[in-house]
UniProtKB/Swiss-Prot annotation:
The species this protein was found in: Caldivirga maquilingensis (strain ATCC 700844 / DSM 13496 / JCM 10307 / IC-167)
Name of the molecule in the record: Anthranilate phosphoribosyltransferase
Positions of 5-phospho-alpha-D-ribose 1-diphosphate binding: 79, 82-83, 87, 89-92, 107-115, 119
MF GO annotations: anthranilate phosphoribosyltransferase activity; magnesium ion binding
Gene that this polypeptide is encoded by: trpD
Role according to the record: Catalyzes the transfer of the phosphoribosyl group of 5-phosphorylribose-1-pyrophosphate (PRPP) to anthranilate to yield N-(5'-phosphoribosyl)-anthranilate (PRA).
Assigned keywords, A-Z: Amino-acid biosynthesis, Aromatic amino acid biosynthesis, Glycosyltransferase, Magnesium, Metal-binding, Transferase, Tryptophan biosynthesis
Binding site for anthranilate 2: R165
Record GO biological process: L-tryptophan biosynthetic process
Length: 339
């Protein structure tokens, strides 16, 4: 580890293999706490590079509890979190909607850190058992098109890093690689990024990892979601190619709203906001949901144009009983399993 620390201190980039070996040493507790803290802080201060993010992601994928997904069209909507703006849990409701509309979704996520409602909190409030075993997760995915992979359960080695991360109290490279380490090794994903400045690095890292189709999104005024409050910056990764562009709500056929209209204080408020949106009585919530679901449908190859995805969601608005029945049924299936 010391040669790597010296390399970082000199401002040099670690190779993918060096980063991978460093991450493995940390995850397997072969590195001391001081070395781990020094490496994480050194990378953050200098700025993480693509090979380093890819190397850490490779190690995290290797040490996870695997869900043996073989379908290349399964998607995820996990993001970095950390925007601190306490918006409704749109990535999870969008994942459920995408599944209802025919896409297989293996949602990877955790409890809230900086938001009012993390994906795990939101799903628990809906009645889901968030700790299903891999065989149940795969069964749910194949039979019901939706399953959840609770990050602490599927990445047990991460508990070895938590004491150092808590003491540091800042964003580290592990915040970046967590969303890139879905236990099903999905090849398609909408990945929200709270920190716009790292999107290019994450896009390059995703190209090294080997995604078929990945959308990195960062929306105004600083959310790790597709925004209906201003512009959304997007890095679109297909294999080794990366395209960068910006979209605005009117391009999706949506209005521009105020962020305060989708802020919630707890998971139950997030559910109520989603229900009101899909009833057609909360336009801001509906448009926020539609924009993010549209990108999930697009990355899955279900629609060729995100505007068609928006239209698919709008058709549910005002007549969402079947959708909520679907959600309740999937939640009931999850409760039959106990880890």
């Amino acid at each position: 580890m010391r040669p790597l620390l010296e390399k970082i201190a000199r401002g040099l980039e670690l190779s993918l293999e060096e980063a991978y070996n460093a991450a493995l040493a940390i995850l397997k507790m072969e590195a001391g706490e001081a070395e781990t803290a020094a490496l994480l802080m050194g990378l953050r201060v200098r700025g993480e590079r693509a090979f380093e993010v890819a190397g850490f992601a490779k190690a995290l994928r290797e040490t996870c509890l695997r869900i043996p997904v073989n379908d290349p069209y399964v998607i995820d909507t996990a993001g970095t979190g950390g925007d601190g703006l306490r918006t409704m849990n749109v990535s999870t409701i969008s994942a459920l909607l995408a599944a209802y509309l025919g896409v297989k979704v293996l949602k990877h996520g955790n409890r809230s850190v900086s938001s009012s409602s993390g994906s795990a909190d939101f799903l628990e409030a809906l009645g889901f058992n968030i700790s299903v075993k891999p065989e149940t997760a795969l069964l749910m995915l194949n039979n019901h098109r939706f399953s959840f992979a609770f990050a602490p359960m599927y990445h047990p080695a991460m508990k070895n890093v938590m004491p150092v991360r808590r003491r540091l109290g800042i964003r580290t490279i592990f915040n970046l690689v967590g969303p890139l380490a879905n236990p099903g090794l999905v090849r398609r994903q909408v990945l929200g990024v709270a920190e716009a400045g790292i999107m290019g690095v994450m896009a390059e890292a995703a190209g090294l990892i080997g995604y078929d189709h990945l959308l990195l999104v960062h929306g105004e005024p600083g959310i790790d979601e597709v925004s209906v409050f201003g512009r959304t910056m997007i890095y679109e990764v297909k294999g080794n190619s990366i395209d960068k562009y910006v979209i605005e709500p009117p391009e999706l056929g949506l209005r521009i709203h105020e962020l305060r209209d989708v802020v919630v204080s707890n998971p139950m408020e997030s559910i109520e906001k989603a229900k009101r949106g899909l009833m057609g009585v909360d336009e801001a919530a509906l448009d926020f949901i539609a924009a993010n679901t549209a990108m999930a449908l697009y990355v899955a190859g279900k629609v060729k144009d995100p505007r068609d995805g928006v239209e698919a969601v709008k058709q549910i608005a005002g007549n969402s009983n079947d959708f909520w029945s679907y959600v309740n049924n999937v939640a009931a299936v999850s409760r039959r399993d106990s880890a």
